[in-house]
């Protein structure tokens, strides 16, 4: 699986992005990756923001990894940065889906949790993870990403055939990682 931190800086900060905008480390992508790695899932991270990758190069890099699932992690230290991050994540996911329509795309983040149905209605999004997404992602990865999705708590997905005839489904919530399991289920959090 590939975690992607898309670059929204040029759209959000325009000319200031070249020299003045900060590059935020993809903290939540790192935490999710380590959590999945601890469960023996293969993971990689592509930080388009740090590498300042143009859209076409980011698509090529994602395709070259040939991931089973692409997870766009749209979080930031500022609570509203998830919404700003949707600019770059949406543009990259749209281009990726146009070029590689069978590649499953998932979104997780503060904007996604606040407006899961809106994000799931985007034509390039196949799955959303609600809340922090840790257990939901682990359980989603235990499926074939096509069947038995109704049993995976904490996700949203598109049911039915592909294209215009699908319906968005939000499953019941999945609990967040309890404090006494942080070292086990979120290694590296502190």
How should these model regions be labeled?
Residues 1-190:
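Acidic, low-complexity intrinsically disordered segments
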